[in-house]
Regions:
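Short, T/G/N/S-enriched strand-turn elements that build extracellular solenoid repeat scaffolds
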Residues: 44-45, 67-69, 168
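C-terminal/domain-terminus segments
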Residues: 145-175, 179
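Extracellular beta-strand-rich, repetitive "passenger/adhesive" scaffolds
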Residues: 53-55
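Terminal amphipathic alpha-helical/low-complexity segments used for targeting or macromolecular assembly
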Residues: 1-51, 108-111, 178-194
Length: 194
């Protein structure tokens, strides 16, 4: 679906979303000490992830099967991943609370974006999607939105409340709405230097 207009109400897509939402709901109903149960649910929800991430419930996924987590990565409460197309999250990625990754996009022109009426009387619209990549060793603080088409470079930190609409180069501290690079992360940022 990357970059192509599609109907999100397609019956096959509806079934995939329903499955992911049911699995996420089951996961969200578990307690933190039910590790084995959580692991089994995540294996089904995220079938393309080899090592299951540490996810604090609640979590929400559009499909799950389009999200790939690397080793030792995780997300705090209220992680939302609208994974219409691939979302790659690298190794050692920390995701703070209330972070949304949104790959779906809608056309800018109203005549392309507006709802349409099918012959059977049902309504639909069209959308497209762009992938998201978060490279290894990144930290996304709280209340961040990452939009489709973005790559966050290795070792970068995204400040709380940011809306990331453009790619961020490696080893950058970036903040704001829209998110902008403030400076490069260097050896001077080591805790022992503070």
């Amino acid at each position: 679906l990357t970059g192509q207009l599609y109907d999100p109400s397609d019956p096959e897509l509806d079934q995939l979303r329903l499955k992911a939402r049911k699995l996420a709901r089951r996961y969200n109903m578990t307690d933190e000490d039910e590790r084995e149960k959580r692991y089994k649910i995540l294996k089904e929800l995220l079938p393309n992830t080899l090592e299951m991430p540490d996810l604090q419930a609640p979590v929400y996924f559009d499909y799950g099967c389009n999200t790939y987590f690397g080793k030792y990565s995780g997300a705090n409460f209220h992680f939302t991943c609208l994974d219409v197309c691939p979302v790659h999250i690298g190794d050692n990625v920390m995701i703070g609370p209330n972070v949304t990754i949104a790959t779906p996009m809608h056309p800018m022109l109203p005549e392309e974006r507006n709802c349409r009426l099918r012959e059977d009387g049902s309504i639909y619209n069209l959308e497209y999607a762009k992938p998201v990549t978060i490279e290894n060793d990144c930290w996304l603080a709280a209340n961040i939105v990452v939009c489709g088409g973005v790559t966050i470079g290795e070792g970068s930190v995204i400040g709380a409340g940011s809306v990331v609409t453009k790619s961020i180069p490696p080893h950058s501290l970036a903040v704001g709405n829209p998110c902008r690079v403030v400076r490069e992360i260097t050896e001077e940022d080591r805790m022992e230097q503070r």
